[in-house]
Curated annotation (Swiss-Prot):
Name listed for the protein in its UniProt record: Structural maintenance of chromosomes protein 6
GO cellular component terms attached to this protein's record: nucleus; site of double-strand break; Smc5-Smc6 complex
Subunit structure: Forms a heterodimer with smc5.
Subcellular location: Nucleus; Chromosome
Coiled-coil segments: 337-570, 808-1024
Keyword presence, Methyltransferase: no
Entry keyword Hydrolase: no
Gene responsible for this protein: smc6
Amino acid sequence: MSKRKLGHDGNSHELDEEEEEEEEDDDDELIHSTQDQDRPHKQQRVENGKQMTPTKQHQQQQQQQPISNGRLKKLKAQSSDEESGSSEDDDEDVEDVDSSGSDSGSSDDDDDDDDDDDDDDGNSEDEREAVRREQQLKSGVTEPEAGIIESITLENFMCHRHFKLDFCSNVNFIAGENGSGKSAVLIALIVCLGAKAGFTNRGSKLSDLVKAETNTAVITVKLRNQGQEAFKPEKYGKSVIIERRISRTGSSGYKVKDYNGKTVSDKFNDVSLILEQFNIQIDNPMSILTQDTSRQFLNSAGPQDKYKSFLMATQLDKMTKDYTTIREHIDKIKDMLSQKVVVIQELEKKVREYNKEYKDLQQMVGLERKISEFKNQLAWSFVVESEREAKRKEKQVAEAEERSFDNDIRKVDETIETYNKSIEDIKKDIKEFTDQIKIQEQKKETNNREILTIEREEAKIQTQIEANNKKRQQRKQRRHLQLQSINEIKERNAQLANNQSKLDEIKKKGQQKLQLEARKEELIKEKEDLMRDRENLKRDHQNQRTITQQMNREYEGLRVQLNNLRSTQKGENQAYGKGMTDFLHKIEASRRNFSKLPIGPIGLSLKIKNESWAFAIESAISKATLRNFLVFSIPDGITLQKLGHQFGIKVDYTKIPETTEVYKTVEHDELDPSLATVLRVLDSPSHFIINFLIDTKKVEQIGLGNDRKEIDSVLYTDRCPRGLSQFFDPQGNNYSKTKSGNPFYQAAKNSGEATMLRVNSDAAIQRTQRDMESKLPALNQQKKIEQELSSDVQAIEHKISQNDQDQNQCSRKILQITNEIKSIEDTLVQQTDDYSELEIGLASLDEEIKSMDEEINIQKAQRTEVAAQKGPFAENNRALDDQIDVLSNQLGNIENNLRKFNEGLRKLNNNKQALLQQQGRSAQERDQFKAEYQRILEIVKEKTDKATQICERIEIPTNETNTTLTNKIIQYTKQLEKESRGKRSRTEALKLFQDANNSLKEISEQRDNIEELATILERNLNERYKKWQRFRLSISRRSDQYFNIFLSKKGYTGSLTFDHQNGKLDINVELQKALPSNQNGTAKGDTKGLSGGERSFSTVSLLLAFWENMECPFRAMDEFDVFMDEVNRSISINLLMSKAEENRSKQYIFVTPLALNHIKTSEYVKVFRVRAPVRTGGDVTVETD
């Protein structure tokens, strides 16, 4: 396997595996970096002709990596290898290009000394390069590099609605009139590959590049992915497609697709890896020279800016930064060595002091020996005492085994058996009496059935009697009515003369009734209109009343807030409760009662860097948390609550761990520095409070935004950093996401000023007073509007009530007239027939009534006869009831006896259960005694083992006990302490001496290792920096040579004067045309004095010189010929074409406003002619040659 190498001719060469391994070892020696295992990270530096730029991650690893002895040995070995082969490296690492001129800008002595040595190598290198290119041309076209642009597509970007170009692999010209949008192609290219809006000089933000009247712009760039430098070809195929979408709202996103258009990733990190693999330098202005850069480069750029462009184009600036970082790290190592020297001096002093102290303590042995004897006796005295306790427990076990409850349980079982037999006999008697009672009840049931049959017959007869009585009554009623009708007919016949006057009265009253009904209909319609008006007024009144209540609540809230602020102004502590000041004084006075002084209330120790966030932070943290106290132990918290109770303050506290500093959160490493969070806005002198808020409230994950628009642009887009969970605005409103990722908004419960977190109470009071004064007129006006609507509602309610009264009056009059008409109609006399038939029917009814009376008397006699049949059966039932009562009484007595026996049996069972429990407890007690006996035996064994470890068993004097021996040990120990007071023990002194001596050896070894490592690093860095200087000199000379060669195509001469020490680059161009024969050149050297065409041609020549040292697979330049005449343009184009033809593996893109009709197209040359788009929309027309 081989890798590409940057040669001095700007082209890629192959490195074999052996060279690659040597360079990787050198990388480890210099920066101790480890390559990321997840992606193919290309390191670029100046080492054996290869470029390597360590990333920030490598620098951080270098600073944090500990220095081990193994690494030190490796560095020593590498250093010795480098020293032995340094002469060879100096000859092989840098191959300079032969320069006919001198580097007039180089003021570095080292550079001047190496000029002669490098010239010879440069000549051979040019010859080899010329031969290589000639062989390529003869053998065929070189394969295009991976990373060249195959096509680019623009949708709704700048002036283009839809625009696509398919590039060839070598030379591409994009021609078009001014305003045709040809420059937008290069802008789209750099934007799609990751550039920011400011880099394009076409707007302050990316959304400015979205086409007018559209919402989203899409740029798609297709890159070649073939060859040795292909990026994961098995995954992406022969092309990689990068798509970037830009929204009008300012958001943007990436998609990385394979050859078939399938999305593989949507992360910018993958885009960066692809650009790094292809060596595409999108931030290098020399790689893609835009219109503005092209016009201003030679005009306005100063020597320093031009030198920076040179470094950026050749990537030397990245290596400069890397060497600077390593130099800073070496300086830090030297600072560390200085600190180690101070520590070693202190440790040497302590070692001497501890050694002297130990030698002074070699005495006082007699008392210690006596104390040791007493301690031995004390150890065995505990054994003797435990052995006595074991004997007592052994006796208790024997006594417990002698106790037994078996005889008592057997007697109770015998009595229970006797009771069970008696209960069985009683149950038999109960069954016998129960059977007799059932027989008597069956007989009674038979009698009852007979009685029921008789009663049914009796009821049937009674029903017939009642039916006949009903018919008789009906006949009598008909007779009465018929008789009444006869009399009425006779009376009406006498009144027929009065009918006409009554009919006239009925007609008159009918007209009055019609008039009243019409009036009632009018009143009903009027009421419906009034009801609608009333509903509308009520709705308006309710709305205005709601508004009034809301405004009143806001005004009262401001009043309460003003009172709170005034209370806060009187005393900052009063905002946390009455008596808080005295309570805090009491805590300070009682600090001895605490293991460590409590902290709180938390809010008193918090300061806000910007007062505008006070209410938002108070809402996010909560007032309850601000009132909280922090303690370091539970007893401290209990003591704190007791003190608070004395002042009527309920104390809430939280136990916190001991820490030494604020948590090292990842927030400051990941979040945008311009993004405000609660943690960044807060400040406190106590790191315990900050850590507590991080643990309980996650203040590092709560963002702050000025308004909803600003918060939405961060929280609900891809810009939202991972871990940022919610936002608050200055009004205390909360913005967050649900579990499914949907937006969630929660308005603040109370709005206004913060009362606990304050910076300026006077300003807050004045603001609150101004708010109250501004709201009061509107509140009074709103109350007036509500009162007017209330009066209107009452007025219309009165109209509705009056309408109801009018309707009721009409209804009463209509009813009265209706009744009067009915009464008159009832008095009208109708002509009737003869009533003789009615008199005949009356006689017939009299006969029917008489016949029914006779039938009813017969049925009553039958009923009396049937009722007499029930007597014998009822008498028999009474006798059966007497027998059942006697049997029931006897059965009750037997059942009472059964209950008594059952109760006795229950008591016996309880007694037996109690005996069984006592027996169980006795067995449990016996087992407990045995277990205790075994436990004491184990204690005896354990104490014996411990005592044996101290000494062999010794006899304890009979007059000695644990107490007496302990007292003697204390007495002798006090005497020993008295004699050795103010001195350490020999053991402690020896340990201190040994620890200090070991620390001294360890730190001395560390100092030697670090000092040796710093020497190796500094020597290696100096050697590499010298190589880099020679490499820089080689590149600058080659750039100067190529610049002069390219200028000579038009008969110009020029030079690039480098001042590496001061970072300056001066460009000189001298014209040699149209000169008198007696002159050798013009004095025109400053590029600002050149004409537009001359300056453009010089720019092309300089850029081509820089391009010779670039590895980017494609180059682009906008309006390179804008100020040239036809001659300059022809020479410039021929120069560009010839350079492109020499290097078919690279791709060139040139943008020009001219037609380029003379350009001959081929497989390797393509011309795109862009017509101006219609600004209101439409596709761009492209003609391709």
